[in-house]
Amino acid sequence: METNFYKFFKKSLFTDLHLTISDSEDSIEMNVHRIILCAKSSYFNTLLTGEFRENNSKDLKIIVQDRIIARDIILNMYGRLLYNDDYPDWYYNLLLIQCKDFFGMTINPESIYKLKVPSEAYDLLVQVVNMFKINSDLVSLLVDNLPSEYDLSKIPINVFQLMCQHTKRDYVIFPDSKKIGIVELFGSDFTNKRNYIQTKKSPENITVSSNQIAVSTYSGSIHIYSLMTLEKIHKIKTSCVKLSYTSDGSYLLAVVRESEISVCIIVYCSKTFQIVSKINIDDFVNVFCCTSDNKYILVANKTKIDVWDLQTGQFIKTMGICKNKINCIDCSSNNKYIASGDDDGQTIVWDFETGNIVKTFISMSEIYAVKFTLDNKRIAYGGRNRKLKLDYFGNTDTLSNKDYILTTLSHQYYEYIYDIKFTSCDKYIVFSGRDNDIVCVEVGTVNSCHRLDTKNVTIKNIGVFSDYNNETIRNYIHQMKNKNSEKIDI
């Protein structure tokens, strides 16, 4: 039927309206049928049937963004297929959507999902994308076409946040022989995208913040690298046996053995690398961690946990006395709980304020790694028994008394689990041990387990961080963080 309509148009049969379509450059005149335009377009239906003077007029002039594309849309109302001989495909498809929207017609984003748009037209692409309910294909379209120097502040915040989520990746950083390895995670699998930072001496300890990597080597120095460029930005000449950033990266803490009988924890500002405080410890420091509010340092000395003021270096209290040597501790992100693992095979969750035990989990052998989930509801722990467990510790939770075994290490050379880290959103657990593998396990599964062979014999500590695999977004995020902007919440 619509083929006949197009024949009527070409021969000007039964036409009842002379239409002039104008843009900023020229005009096109067409003899058309009111009923066709009104049936296909709410714009024309309102204009030609409403209380406007065009209602009874035989001539109608409209001004559009592009006369050629408007003409093609009207011809398509008659059944002629859309085809483009005048413009680049990207321009035609974007303007086609804008013009259809102007005419009050249904618009569909599927035609632009695979478009390649030049950098000078990115603003137009953003305008068109904002006409739709945003979806993953449109986010991919924006990311794939993003120019290297584009001002991302021009993109609506909700759309920009989705672009950030789309490009956000988790990375694992680990010490290797005379180098630092960085590998990208794709789900629970390790990709082939790897970077290395060469070091003169093999790294002993490694820690990562949102913008820095700190490494201590056997040569007696702490080397600081930019996470953006992977270039060395500072060197601290001190012999360090343990090293860690605070959770927000504001401070770098180093355990320094000043003599055979003297140990201290030095707190450095991560921007200036000036010493903020110095905590003298009378005994050996097994392990330490910080509260996420940067108020306290928790130090495990053999069988007890001491609490120190991070800013002043003053002793606060002793809590968490265990029966045997404490091998690992962690603090929940809400600063309410402390977890410890010891040589007795006990994983204990403590109430930080009262010092009372919230929950105790018993294993058959030593515990060497503990880690709270980001939601502060579960604790992951592992050690010499070749098992990594994830358990609810809240007494009100129905699963609090059930051990959930994430994975049992069947590899014959696995003996210990030394370090545990969660990726963003608690979706994956990454751990290392006394072997040359780093393992990633998807939370909630048993079989989704992947290994990264690092060729290293023992990896005692690893780092996990999130970054963006689009350079424009990555640079913008880091600039905003440096300005302490409140704009971005991702």
Swiss-Prot record:
The keyword Translocase does not apply. WD repeats lie at residues 196-235, 237-274, 280-318, 321-362, 364-403, 412-451. Belongs to the mimivirus BTB/WD family. This is Putative BTB/POZ domain and WD-repeat protein R739. It comes from Acanthamoeba polyphaga mimivirus. InterPro entries: BTB/POZ_dom, SKP1/BTB/POZ_sf, WD40/YVTN_repeat-like_dom_sf, WD40_repeat_CS, WD40_repeat_dom_sf, WD40_rpt, WD_repeat_multifunction. Residues 15-91 form the BTB domain. PANTHER family: ANGIO-ASSOCIATED MIGRATORY CELL PROTEIN, MITOCHONDRIAL DIVISION PROTEIN 1-RELATED. PROSITE patterns: BTB (PS50097), WD_REPEATS_1 (PS00678), WD_REPEATS_2 (PS50082), WD_REPEATS_REGION (PS50294). It comes from the Viruses.
